């Protein structure tokens, strides 16, 4: 209110000063029409005596109401639900003895300007202090839990902390609110019923500060709890990993113990057998005490029953090798690109503390580690990114590496590779260098032995394969049973060659060759092509199983699938794998012949049209459409012959000839329809075979009638009409044999009546 009055007085004073200091306006004569108005005397115009300038100007009711409304708004900020009471602003304010300003702060000798300066200095210090206090409250240290907000701290500086007044001290207010017997309604009625606006403002501010402090404490407690939970969670994860590692180690230990137990049991069994055998030999010696000499007891290796080897130790050794390779893959970056975990591959030696030298100057280049495998040499150098890991520098097959020791130094080895590159390495220990050289020599000797065994096995396989190729005959075009080539050829003909070699012996040789190919020792990795060939060779047995169960469709599909894969592999196969490819191709040809032979028998003996169509379609899938059509037509010819034989006696010639015409020509018509259904894509190429067969069947019909006329029997016009009717029915499928009937009538016109 004081500030508002001072502002208004200052504006009035400026207006008076401006009017007094403008001489131009005083020169203007006054208007005669309007009377001269008296200007109000400004109480602040004469400020010579500061003691008389303390009197405040009066404020009207409207401005006083505006000031009161502003004060209500300031008080309503602290409490949103605050409703200001209806007050009479004409009444004087009550006395406030608690708010007496100390005498130290009042100086009657100060003038108006010094009073304003002092207020400005106090207001300028206030925000900085509150800023420092609020910054200190926002720190997240553990010691800041009990700190109060800035406003409470500022208020506590005015009121001592030892005071128990809840209106001025937030600590006492907090204790009061924490009391379980605290009643808010009673407190408001007793303490705040007759309180002043300033007291209510202080109490509201204390409540707000206390609420902020509690919220900050809650946030800090939540943050602390979250950090503790995360710490416990991390510890649990570490413990879980350790438990998994311990569990894996326990499982490995159990496996090793089980294997050791099995090995011990087998060794005890073998030892018992050896002891029993020795005891039996000792009894035999005692029974033959009259013999001139005593025979030594049989050893374990001399008994055929004891020649069985215990391979459990080999399995343990292979697992140990795999573990070493896995460790190599973890420690050496890029090792998996050059080394595969193939069965039998293992590490012979791992030598560290080697230094690669310049072959020309002999200066050291980098630290390396050399790994000698049973068929590879891997050299790894230190990785620049990681201090403890290695990265692959060179990797070559052992047979392509030549290692020599320098004459003037026992610690240096010169490695010469197949690509005409060479590297010089030096070791700190001369014994380590000699041991590495011995391991390489032994590994190369083992590779030479394996290579010789492979050469002998390959030579034997080539000779056997060459023998099979010379004795094996592939079905050719002459086996096609087309009516144009051989109409009455026996369907049970054999395709065995002229030499005295049976199919059983060929099969026996093929089995031995396959076993020899798969049992070959391999010094290098089995390529993907070789693995596919082995898989295809196993698929040949599936054909035999399906064929034995008379599942011709599955057998044909498997055969065609293997043939397509062999054709794909033949383009990128090596010379070493070409022999196995030819061997599998030879076995596939045998299975093809077996399938075609059994399909031929099935087609000829089938009386159901469904099985007949299925067998014919399978023959077409095998690439034998002409042979399939020939078998199909021969089956239909046999079917016509069987139906004719079932007619019986020929007491009524007219009825007999009518039945002959119906059987033959209706079967021909049905056969043409089945041909169009089975041979959809190949009908245009082999339709001539069908037309020839139909023509032959029509000729056979008239030949059979001629045999009936040999007994001087006469033909009735009814039988001729029935034959003409059936022949005309063939026109529906595109066949017209009316001219054959006309020729028959002309030839036997004298016997028709």
Swiss-Prot record:
Show the InterPro entries listed in the entry: Cullin_repeat-like_dom_sf, Exo84, Exo84_C, Exo84_C_1, Exo84_C_2, PH-like_dom_sf
Recorded GO cellular component terms are:
cellular bud neck; cellular bud tip; exocyst; incipient cellular bud site; mating projection tip; prospore membrane; transport vesicle
Q: Where is the composition biased (Basic residues)?
A: 7-18
Here the segments flagged for biased composition (Polar residues) are 115-136, 467-476
Superkingdom, natural source: Eukaryota
Q: Which keywords has UniProt assigned to this entry?
A: Coiled coil, Cytoplasmic vesicle, Exocytosis, Isopeptide bond, Phosphoprotein, Protein transport, Transport, Ubl conjugation
Region of interest: Disordered: 1-69, 101-136, 467-498
Please report the name of this protein according to its UniProt entry: Exocyst complex component EXO84
